[in-house]
Swiss-Prot record:
Listed CDD domains: PRAI (cd00405)
GO cellular component: chloroplast
Tree of life domain: Eukaryota
EC number from the UniProt entry: 5.3.1.24
Transit peptide: 1-32
Species whose genome carries this gene: Arabidopsis thaliana
Pathway(s): Amino-acid biosynthesis; L-tryptophan biosynthesis; L-tryptophan from chorismate: step 3/5
Regulation: induction: By silver nitrate and UV irradiation.
Enzyme class, spelled out: isomerase
Recorded name of the encoding gene: PAI2
Official protein name in the record: N-(5'-phosphoribosyl)anthranilate isomerase 2, chloroplastic
Length: 275
């Protein structure tokens, strides 16, 4: 996938006529492109991540498709449905102001179901400090923590050295990013997730106008925001993210519990897309 997020070597493409970059695909294949020229009077920026103590790759399951994160899971039952359908990540809202918020004890039960099914449990945090997030992650047996809001994002540089992190970027309706990743630590994040300005609302943004920023993470990037079974194929085809995140798009009529038929339809639509 030709995006600005890679896992090994990153070059600001404006400085080159062509570039050399190594990119791990979802099928565990490595694609390389060779540099053929350098544009004069432009700066070249290159950074290579330290290969020591690298967190495990989330694409090692070798599936030739985008990875799937099902978020806003509120019960072990819904987690089991999601895992059985093929979800790679099970997301839980650890934020009291969300209608899909759950307690740490329920989160621990969900984490157990996720891990037993081969999925990774993710805790979603909004405006919490690093100590609060670390305590909750330990208590709930989370694999990754997802950082929303300026408060939680401010703790990124401290958290990323202790926990696997999904760093959230928000885009407005026109597809313009409203925040950025700290450049000095962005390569330490496991994933970059691009969401709408109001995550979990079911509202998306203009995919056609969105431009992926030149940032990198260990695994790549996830797309969220207004995704559902009827539009996920279009979203994947336009932006070709490494993974897709769905929450309200697979909910039942109460907007909280997950709907089995919607989960099935969503997975079927995702599996119909191959990059």
């Amino acid at each position: 996938m030709s995006t600005g997020i890679s896992t090994d070597l990153h070059v600001h493409f404006g400085a080159l006529n062509f570039s050399k970059t190594y990119k791990s695909g979802l099928s565990n294949r490595t694609v390389s492109f060779s540099r053929v020229g350098y544009a004069q009077n432009r700066k070249l920026s290159c950074s290579v991540s330290n290969t020591e103590n690298v967190a495990p790759k989330d694409d090692e399951r070798g599936k030739d498709r985008p990875l799937v994160k099902m978020c806003g899971i509120t019960s072990a039952r819904d987690a089991a449905m999601a895992v059985e359908a093929g979800a790679d990540f099970i997301g839980m809202i650890i934020w009291p102001h969300s209608k899909r918020s759950i307690s740490l004890s329920v989160a621990k039960d969900i984490s157990k179901v996720a891990r037993e099914g081969g999925a990774k449990p993710v805790g979603v945090f909004v405006e919490d400090d690093d100590n609060t997030i670390l305590r909750a992650a330990d208590s709930s047996d989370l694999e990754l923590v997802q950082l929303h809001g300026n408060g939680s994002r401010a703790a990124f540089s401290r958290l990323v050295r202790k926990r696997r992190v999904i760093y959230v970027l928000n885009a407005n309706q026109d597809g313009k990013l409203l925040n950025e990743v700290p450049e000095e630590d962005c390569h330490l994040a496991d994933w970059i997730l691009v969401d709408s300005a109001t995550g979990g609302s079911g509202h998306g943004f203009n995919w056609a106008q969105f431009k992926l920023p030149s940032v990198r993470s260990r695994n790549g990037w996830l797309l969220a925001g207004g995704i559902n079974p009827t539009n996920v194929s279009e979203a994947l085809s336009i932006l070709q993210p490494d993974g897709i995140d769905v929450s309200s798009g697979i909910c039942g009529t109460d907007g909280i519990q997950k709907d089995k038929s919607k989960i099935s339809s969503f997975i079927t639509a995702v599996r119909s897309v191959h990059y």
